């Protein structure tokens, strides 16, 4: 995939969910946004509005998963409806869905200091990184103009890594988190926080 002509993108992770708060792995299952998650989505919507970004200037896309759809609706402030795209769903964690990192360590012996991606790579029945990479690359290749993308933690990092023309060995160099907006244009990444908008 060539990223030389990729349009400007703003990538947003869904707001905090009940399972995020409890430390449970969601993967391709859902849990509702917490009050904090709703607040994060509304703040990100205000940040975009302050930057002059709306459904009139950018195409909005979202994962079809409930936590992302709810975040997208709050971010968009009822301007329009985001286009749902299954390629933006979160990576599956297979049989680890719904359990905590401590439970995973107890079952597998993974080191407490293991990087979070090591857990995804070891998830029994989970989606391989190659599958996530392929669907993210396919999604990006289809963009025709500036876009706002509401997705998930690991999917967000893969999208941004590919958009910057980096190899996946650098995916862990990008920040994650909720309540921030990631901007990629001309292969350059910037994290926009509520204090910076």
Give names to the regions the model predicted.
Residues 4-80, 107, 124-127:
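Active-site-proximal alpha-helix that buttresses catalytic centers in soluble enzyme cores
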Residues 15, 62-65, 87, 150-154, ...:
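Short, well-ordered beta-to-alpha junction loops that form the rim of enzyme active sites
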Residues 163-192:
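Domain-level recognition of soluble alpha/beta enzyme cores
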Residues 74, 158-162:
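Active-site signature of alpha/beta-hydrolase-fold catalytic machinery across serine-
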Residues 9, 58, 142-154:
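Generic beta-sheet signal
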Residues 75-135, 173, 193-195:
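Phosphate-handling substructures
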Residues 42-49, 133, 137-144:
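Generic structural signal for well-ordered alpha-helical scaffold segments
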Residues 76-81, 141-147:
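Short glycine/proline-enriched coil/turn segments at helix->beta-strand junctions
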């Amino acid at each position: 995939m060539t990223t030389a002509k990729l349009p400007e993108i703003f990538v947003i992770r869904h707001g905090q969910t009940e399972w995020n708060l409890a430390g449970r792995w969601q993967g391709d299952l859902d849990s509702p946004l917490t009050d904090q998650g709703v607040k994060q989505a509304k703040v990100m919507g205000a940040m975009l509005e302050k930057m002059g970004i709306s459904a009139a200037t950018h195409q909005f896309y979202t994962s079809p998963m409930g936590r992302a759809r709810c975040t997208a609706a709050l971010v968009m402030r009822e301007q329009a409806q985001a286009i749902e795209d299954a390629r933006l769903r979160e990576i599956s964690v297979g049989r680890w869905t719904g359990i905590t990192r401590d439970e995973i360590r107890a079952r597998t012996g993974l080191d407490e200091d293991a990087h979070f991606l090591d857990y995804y790579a070891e998830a029994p029945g989970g989606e391989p990184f190659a599958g996530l990479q392929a669907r993210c690359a396919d999604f990006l290749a289809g963009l025709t103009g500036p876009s706002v993308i509401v997705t998930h933690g690991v999917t967000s990092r893969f999208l941004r890594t590919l958009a910057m023309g980096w190899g996946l060995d650098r995916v862990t160099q990008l920040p994650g988190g909720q309540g921030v907006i990631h901007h990629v244009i001309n292969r350059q990444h910037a994290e926009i926080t509520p204090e910076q908008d």
